Amino acid sequence: MWILFAFGSALFAGLTSILAKCGIKNTDSNTATAIRTIIVLIFSWIMVFLVGAQHGIGSVSAKTWTFLILSGLATGASWLCYFRALQIGDVDKVVPVDKSSAILSILLAFLFLHESISPLKLLCVVLIGAGTYLMITKKETSSENSRKKGWSWFFYALGSAVFASLTSILGKVGIENIDSNLGTAIRTIVVLIMAWIVVFVTKKQDSVRTIDHRELGFICLSGLATGASWLCYYRALQDGLASVVVPIDKLSILVTILFSYLVFHEKLGKKEAGGLVLIVAGTLGMLV
């Protein structure tokens, strides 16, 4: 059953990137992140009360609270980096870098969770890494805005990947003795606080009143998709292996690439398509 939750997470995560890109064309990415986190928080707590998990708050240990808070901080940092990268870069470049967090997650799972790395899994790591390289070194045929920003999108995307890998490991430790829905909801509170602190520190709070209604709609929809992805992901992570759940979640790249072509007309050349095949092959190889 946890496999199905993992694939559900991938589907919703793929839609999140497209919806978010549509919502941050003219809206500050940090402000958008803070707004959409409100949607995720509401969604998360609705699920908590639906399953009756709210009664477990009193039994959460100090250790679990610590790791949930740390996981929330890592998630917040990952989101802020990711949506900034999406705003200034092309979807079909940013997403592969973000999805490469699977590589670091596998290594961290080996070091801290004692999950084994077989020769096949090591080969899959190489395939994912090679595929990511091929996809991000595509010819510069993208948007004028992306060209003006150069490679700044890459460093934001890389930061997103690093923090995302830390999120998966810290989340795995933090949800061992807590309902997955409750764990997600608690982490989201941390993300929300962090996101709004960034908005006020950068003095972008006044921009909330001037956001285009259409973009605001897409931002909210991306929040709903994220909430659904999170709940599926951490439910799968609680029962399954982090080194398997994380790669399946990264299959969201297929959904994202498809819609980036349909919505933003971002086309893949032969080299980039080959890179995508390598990423998918490496991801599916993790399931063997």
Locate predicted features.
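Membrane-interface interhelical linkers
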Residues: 1-12, 20-68, 79-89, 137-156, ...
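Residues that define the loop-to-transmembrane-helix transition and helix capping
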Residues: 30-31, 92, 118-120, 181-182, ...
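Hydrophobic/aromatic residues within transmembrane alpha-helices
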Residues: 23, 32, 85, 111-113, ...
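Juxtamembrane helix-loop boundary signature in multi-pass membrane transporters
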Residues: 1-8, 103-162, 269-288
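Hydrophobic alpha-helical transmembrane segments in multi-pass integral membrane proteins
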Residues: 44-55, 105-118, 161-176, 225-239, ...
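Alpha-helical transmembrane segments of compact multi-pass small-molecule transporters, enriched
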Residues: 39-43, 97-111, 190-194, 248-262, ...
